[in-house]
Amino acid sequence: MKFLIPTAKEIKEDNKPYPQHLSQKSQILVNHMNALSIEELEKSYKVSPQIAQTELLKWQDIKNGEALAYPALYLFNGLMYRHIKRQHLTVEEKAFLKEKVFITSALYGIIPALKPIVPHRLDFNTKVKIKGESLKNYWRKTYDNFVLDNPSIVSLLSSEFEAVFSPKLRNQLITLRFLENQNGQLKSHSTISKKARGAFLTQVIQQQTKTVDELKTISFNGFSYQDNLSEPLKLIFIKQSK
């Protein structure tokens, strides 16, 4: 069983840097981004000219091999990541992380959580075409092959990242939903989901969870599995309001 988590917009460059390494597919993407003008980057990212200028310089550093890379799990610092246990890992927990947890990226594809990557702004909502393809289509075969090679995958992804997979293989992912029971109504929003995904993955790492049945036994921060609302590949966890 493998676990997929998305990248995040917030980053924190305070860990030991490493030399960068790009796959051939990532290098093609980097070359394309370097060929864009500041005006094109401004439109693609939907940012100001000043930010576009900064991003162009970053892409030039990446292409020239001058950008520093950081372990992905520690580089990202979004809400979900801040709820994942990343410090003071035991030997067993770190080994589990290295083998079981992967990060989905618009620049790198699907990578081990501890792989060093360079800070970048690219995501699947960035409006660029690589060889005439959107970023989602550019990476689709790579993402699909990961599912074909790993028959049991738990998705802790947002819809933006799940949409990269072809529909047939997307339906093979084990997905999780985290809802709060507020006065008899089940509710969810991005803050609830992001916090819960991070805290859930922490439990997975600590408990060395390896099967769907073991996933169902996890309870954390008031959330617990609800069999009556779940389906074989869609697991629902509810937090009861006080």
From Swiss-Prot:
Q: Which domain of life is it from?
A: Bacteria
One GO cellular component term: cytosol
Native source organism of the sequence: Streptococcus mutans serotype c (strain ATCC 700610 / UA159)
Q: Which cysteines are joined by disulfide bonds?
A: none
Q: Which InterPro entries match?
A: YaaA
Q: Which family does it belong to?
A: Belongs to the UPF0246 family.
- Designated name of the protein: UPF0246 protein SMU_2070
Q: Cite the HAMAP family for this sequence.
A: UPF0246
Listed under GO biological process in this entry are: response to hydroperoxide
Instruction: Report any Pfam family annotated for this entry.
Output: H2O2_YaaD
